[in-house]
Swiss-Prot record:
It comes from the Bacteria. Coiled coil: none annotated. The gene is prfA. GO terms for molecular function: translation release factor activity, codon specific. It is found in: Cytoplasm. Keywords: Cytoplasm, Methylation, Protein biosynthesis. Belongs to the prokaryotic/mitochondrial release factor family. This is Peptide chain release factor 1. The keyword Acyltransferase does not apply. It comes from Pseudomonas aeruginosa (strain ATCC 15692 / DSM 22644 / CIP 104116 / JCM 14847 / LMG 12228 / 1C / PRS 101 / PAO1). Peptide chain release factor 1 directs the termination of translation in response to the peptide chain termination codons UAG and UAA. NCBIfam families: prfA, PRK00591.1. PANTHER family: LD18447P. InterPro entries: PCRF, Pep_chain_release_fac_I, Pep_chain_release_fac_I_sf, Prokaryotic/Mito_RF, RF-1.
Amino acid sequence: MKASLLKKLDVLSDRYEELTALLGDAEVISDQTRFRAYSREYAEVEPVILAFRDYRKVQADLEGAQALLKDSDPELRDLAEEEVAEARGRLAALGDSLQRMLLPKDPNDSRNVFLEIRAGTGGDEAAIFSGDLFRMYSRYAERQGWRIETLSENEGEHGGYKEVIARVEGDNVYAKLKFESGAHRVQRVPETESQGRIHTSACTVAVLPEPDEQAAIEINPADLRVDTYRSSGAGGQHVNKTDSAVRITHIPSGIVVECQEERSQHKNRAKAMAWLAAKLNDQQQAAAQQAIASTRKLLVGSGDRSERIRTYNFPQGRVTDHRINLTLYSLGEVMEGAVEQVIEPLLQEYQADQLAALGD
């Protein structure tokens, strides 16, 4: 393990001892805010320190076994060689585990998300593919045990969506979907194509973490224009009676959000405001993400929405993720919701990149 990482672990060990003392301090115990904060930090640090103690113990065992290699007794030397080999294997495994524990954690990983899918080039076929992508992510959400609800939709003339916005709720949603943002290209023969020619269309996907109240940008009500209108979505006769749909325009940024899925104007407004907060947060963080990506030459995680990240080729049954040069011939399974076949290699590549930069 790199010396710089061992130094970080030594500093973390000192902090662990400090936290242990603080949590036993009567003054801290009486202050629930501080006590909760220290308890959370302690819970995060403790597994790392316990693993580090195991690492140091195995390191000492290795040094002891190596010293016995110089012994005059051949049997003892043979035994020492076995112990050295075993200790080196354990040390390597513990070192790998510790490095992963030290990887910087994305504070958004545990958050719910807003999923935006928009048809790009390709007209009707792009809208149809937007519908296919939404179905793919909906199936994936079901497989993960997540809840997905549509906030806004603009249907295409021949099926699919010109635009569809959904909120996805569950465990570690952003952690698994954060690399889906970008341009998704489809190559296939449209149903309306009589001569069997392959057409290329594209859609854009954006995945925005839903900020909590503490993380959300403070929005000045004076910066908002709120319009209400009659919902064009589901709801039977109700949609013709009340202006329950809500459209909110953030005047300084020009961002517009709308929600029409609930029968209650109040609920639609609350969901639209949450979506607006996510978009404003995303806009603020985009520049920082781009700076990090360009500095470290990252392709995975650059967050560039215009970047073509994936191609779905139906005639060949192929899906290709261009960021990591991954090609799979299981397009049917992926479109039915087995998106983990692409997501898992992306996460592994990103983690490998983080590990490479860890000791810098």
